[in-house]
């Protein structure tokens, strides 16, 4: 009677897909080499036949080698290709033949005894669409053909409840020796039987395991996950090839073990008496050729085709967003910038002073780089002119007096991506030239700003006025923070990073926004007309400046010195002879790390500029920073109430006096020269 086998059916846990995705994105990238995967199966006597013979792939199958209690190990490999075209064009038969040859070679050289789980091995061909979260895969369970085929030749014996109980207990002692308890010989389960179960490994057959044992008492056994009454599990096909090739048997009793310890008194195992008689006229493969192989899994309709799992329907939308946000960034590391440190950018906490045109664009771009912590500071409300220029606001935000920009911007970021930690603070930044009207409220704003600066890594100055940038500049310099600054003109902009004091305490090499000034900032909005009060700029200037500011931060964070990175230097290109900026360090994944970028939209030009720190700067000079560190609020209070305090303290007043003296000397010389000329003309 012909023998039919119950094929394996694949069963993948959902966490495995997530693990495969992360492995592809973070590690394998474009490498589609096959890698090992752990498969598991178990005898499930209570399951219906069509639900049995399940090859399970757990969530940790790519990283773990531990086999859970009651399960049997299967050796698997997975080849996760890069495109669906690669999946379709893969030579499936060659792939199956390669897996079959591994089993055949292991049988021939005897290594199968060291890794018997190869007899139930499997191969997975897969493609993970990481954008749509769909996984196309096809399992193959390679089964070698026996030539000629094995047939059932006798009515097999059946075990009694006592025999099954004794076998199950003896197997438990072998598999779990730590659970074995000392027993009274008179009470042993084997003692009531006319024989005793002795269990050996497949290797022991060649050492004479069956010597002196009647043929009817010899069983070659395997753990059978099938529950079909007459059909053994798929891996028996490979075991029968081993029996023919290694044991040289043409008749054998097979014990398909299906019992379990909990119901050991109920016989479940299937016994088969099989025979394979050699026919001289039968055309078989050569003695050393790999036998024919079959094994690609069929779908539920019985067709040889791949399966597709859509993971999106099982995933939490927030989790989908998390993975999607990081996907494009991680793809940069596959080929273009493998040394890019994305975590350095992602973990940077950003404080944005200003939630207007610059602030809304900058925040969106920061999220594009994966930044998770963004905090806004602003005291204005959304007006009807804002939504067309400020992308986080819309018409409804303008109604009833307008929503507070800081609050609404933070909410809008969370609506775009729920995984971002965005908060808003409605407050006024104390400014030079603006007198204190409520000392308690101003001090409270100062203390909150001070705490926010301390709690963040990068400070963005995105306000409308020059004087509003002074205090955050002082605080950022004192705290050693990365300070990023952008300012707009009608068709021009400046984007820059402030110099950071080195760890050795020396002066910062690069200047800040105020280092080129010879006067301290003052009230710049007093007596201004409407066109001067509003930021009148071409609509494309703000997005361009914002993008360069965020890209500059990303470049700073990739530099080994981070905020203390020097400005790039000019040198002659050896090939072209032209002056070019040097990439420092040469392997920087994003290129240059400039100090300042000045853009001119009317000419569609940008210039890279660097400027040293100024020892008389009204914001970042050592005198100002040290006074702030020592006196804190009292220093700020005095700066806001005494008109010339900052000018005198920084040394700018002395610079101005010397400039006036020099100018007077020049004027005096000019007057004398004029007299001489006049006299000459008269003569």
Swiss-Prot record:
Q: Find motif (GXGXXG motif) and give its ranges.
A: 354-359
The record's GO CC annotations read: cytoplasm; phagophore assembly site
Task: Give positions of region: Disordered.
Answer: 566-587, 663-683
Keywords from UniProt, A to Z, are:
Autophagy, Cytoplasm, Protein transport, Transport, Ubl conjugation pathway
Q: Name one GO molecular function term.
A: Atg12 activating enzyme activity
Name the source's superkingdom: Eukaryota
An annotated GO BP: autophagosome assembly
Q: Which InterPro entries match?
A: Atg7, Atg7_N, Atg7_N_1, Atg7_N_2, ThiF/MoeB/HesA, ThiF_NAD_FAD-bd, Ubiquitin-activating_enz
Q: Name one Pfam family in it.
A: ThiF
Task: Specify whether Cytoplasm is a keyword of the entry.
Answer: yes
SUPFAM superfamilies the record matches: Activating enzymes of the ubiquitin-like proteins
The cellular location(s) given in this protein's UniProt record come to: Cytoplasm; Preautophagosomal structure
Q: List the catalytic residues.
A: 534 (glycyl thioester intermediate)
Assembly = Homodimer.
Function statement: E1-like activating enzyme involved in the 2 ubiquitin-like systems required for cytoplasm to vacuole transport (Cvt) and autophagy. Activates atg12 for its conjugation with atg5 and atg8 for its conjugation with phosphatidylethanolamine. Both systems are needed for the atg8 association to Cvt vesicles and autophagosomes membranes. Autophagy is essential for maintenance of amino acid levels and protein synthesis under nitrogen starvation.
Instruction: Please provide the record's free-text comment about the domains of this protein.
Output: The GxGxxG motif is important for the function, possibly through binding with ATP.
Family, according to the entry, reads as follows: Belongs to the ATG7 family.
What protein name does the entry list? Ubiquitin-like modifier-activating enzyme atg7
Recorded source organism is Sclerotinia sclerotiorum (strain ATCC 18683 / 1980 / Ss-1) (White mold)
